[in-house]
């Protein structure tokens, strides 16, 4: 199911992330620090529970979830959201909902790279990770 995503991934490129964070409502100072961070993602699967750890100089976060089951998440910019992650066409598609707002984060494998597409209100950021 999600085994292809398992491993350690390092950020190698980021496009339009500041504009995306601005659309989400992240403040200026947090956007600047987060934009400079080069996170490492560690993805693991234990039974039907998927864990995604993000480690960076900005903040370390960890989410554990079962596909299709809503869970509470505190995002790196301290938003308290309700998240649901599904496997759709080989991609992990996460929807975060908070305060009447919604954003989608799609994680997919392209040429052995992990590509994140973050979308809110038509603003898209693309972040590419390679296996560490």
UniProtKB/Swiss-Prot annotation:
It is found in: Cytoplasm; Nucleus. A motif (Nuclear localization signal) lies at residues 22-32. The modification N-acetylcysteine is found at residue 2. GO terms for molecular function: long-chain fatty acid binding; long-chain fatty acid transmembrane transporter activity. The gene is FABP4. It comes from Cervus elaphus (Red deer). GO terms for cellular component: cytoplasm; nucleus. SUPFAM superfamilies: Lipocalins (SSF50814). Belongs to the calycin superfamily. Fatty-acid binding protein (FABP) family. It comes from the Eukaryota. Keywords: Acetylation, Cytoplasm, Lipid-binding, Nucleus, Phosphoprotein, Transport. The modification Phosphoserine is found at residue 13. Lipid transport protein in adipocytes. Binds both long chain fatty acids and retinoic acid. Delivers long-chain fatty acids and retinoic acid to their cognate receptors in the nucleus. This is Fatty acid-binding protein, adipocyte. InterPro entries: Calycin, Fatty_acid-bd, ILBP, Lipocln_cytosolic_FA-bd_dom. Pfam families: Lipocalin. GO terms for biological process: long-chain fatty acid transport. Monomer. Homodimer. Interacts with PPARG.
